[in-house]
Amino acid sequence: MNLTLNLIQLQTIEMRVHMDCVGCESRVKNALQKMRGVDAVEIDMVQQKVTVTGYADQKKVLKKVRKTGRRAELWQLPYNPDHMGGSSSNGGYFYNPQGCNGPINHAAPVPTSSYNYYKHGYDSNDYSSYRHHPVHASIFSHQTGSKFSDENPNACSIM
């Protein structure tokens, strides 16, 4: 009997999660910290970025964040420790000899997501030609004007 263990390596998962307030941030953070295999959760509200470090599966982490009601997708430029560190003019955040942010020789991969947002109408320009026409009905009926008419003997009189 051959037993093979599926060992998941320590990984860093970066996601873009749409969060509006501190309550959303705490909901996402609490949900992720309760997961088995998650060691650390860092949230950057300015960039709408959530960084999860641990042994948890990427799909399970995405699913857990989406269960909180927040929209989540993988970060476009995945974590790459080769581009971190070093001393440069930009504080060593992303180090490149040219002084630009992000990896230069690599094209940004298309974010992979287990949920097809395009299929469900998110992030699509298909609806740009749709114009919302306001409803022409109002809160007043067509007989409202006759209630205040001088010709109507049962009309209201405003003094």
From Swiss-Prot:
Key word Lipoprotein present: yes
Keyword Iron applies: no
UniProt modified residues of type Cysteine methyl ester: 156
Residues that coordinate or bind a metal cation: 21, 24
Residues excised as propeptide: 157-159
Single annotated GO MF: metal ion binding
Residue ranges occupied by any HMA domain in the UniProt entry: 10-73
Lipid tethering residues (S-farnesyl cysteine): 156
Pfam families named among the record's database cross-references: HMA
Keywords carried by this UniProt record: Lipoprotein, Metal-binding, Methylation, Prenylation
Function description: Heavy-metal-binding protein.
Xref: PANTHER family: COPPER TRANSPORT PROTEIN ATOX1-RELATED, HEAVY METAL-ASSOCIATED ISOPRENYLATED PLANT PROTEIN 28
Family: Belongs to the HIPP family.
Protein name: Heavy metal-associated isoprenylated plant protein 28
Natural source organism: Arabidopsis thaliana (Mouse-ear cress)
Lineage, broadest ranks: Eukaryota, Viridiplantae, Streptophyta, Embryophyta, Tracheophyta
